[in-house]
Amino acid sequence: MSGTTGERPFSDIVTSIRYWVIHSITIPALFIAGWLFVSTGLAYDVFGTPRPDEYYTQARQELPIVNNRFEAKKQVEQLIQK
């Protein structure tokens, strides 16, 4: 016979009013916080990724494609210098 872990059954947790009071506040708050994090551009600053309009400058409009894997470092350096 299996023992018990002493934890509440999941069905008791999901049907409790306390669970829904807490989660009806936290889930929308997390969604709104994530939306603000991305829409204000803070996510770009935190993770250091370029914004969509910064991928290609006016001077460089071609794709930076590496063709030869054995000379990849040299090709990347040439693409950066352009």
From Swiss-Prot:
The chain crosses the membrane at residues 21-35. Belongs to the PsbE/PsbF family. This b-type cytochrome is tightly associated with the reaction center of photosystem II (PSII). PSII is a light-driven water:plastoquinone oxidoreductase that uses light energy to abstract electrons from H(2)O, generating O(2) and a proton gradient subsequently used for ATP formation. It consists of a core antenna complex that captures photons, and an electron transfer chain that converts photonic excitation into a charge separation. Heme binds at H23. This is Cytochrome b559 subunit alpha. Its cofactor is heme b. Heterodimer of an alpha subunit and a beta subunit. PSII is composed of 1 copy each of membrane proteins PsbA, PsbB, PsbC, PsbD, PsbE, PsbF, PsbH, PsbI, PsbJ, PsbK, PsbL, PsbM, PsbT, PsbX, PsbY, PsbZ, Psb30/Ycf12, peripheral proteins PsbO, CyanoQ (PsbQ), PsbU, PsbV and a large number of cofactors. It forms dimeric complexes. PROSITE patterns: CYTOCHROME_B559. InterPro entries: PSII_cyt_b559_asu (IPR006217), PSII_cyt_b559_asu_sf (IPR037025), PSII_cyt_b559_CS (IPR006216), PSII_cyt_b559_N (IPR013081), PSII_cytb559_asu_lum (IPR013082). Keywords: Electron transport, Heme, Iron, Membrane, Metal-binding, Photosynthesis, Photosystem II, Thylakoid, Transmembrane, Transmembrane helix, Transport. With its partner (PsbF) binds heme. PSII binds additional chlorophylls, carotenoids and specific lipids. It is found in: Cellular thylakoid membrane. One of its GO terms (cellular component) is photosystem II reaction center. It is a single-pass membrane protein. One of its GO terms (biological process) is photosynthetic electron transport chain. One of its GO terms (molecular function) is electron transfer activity. NCBIfam families: cyt_b559_alpha.
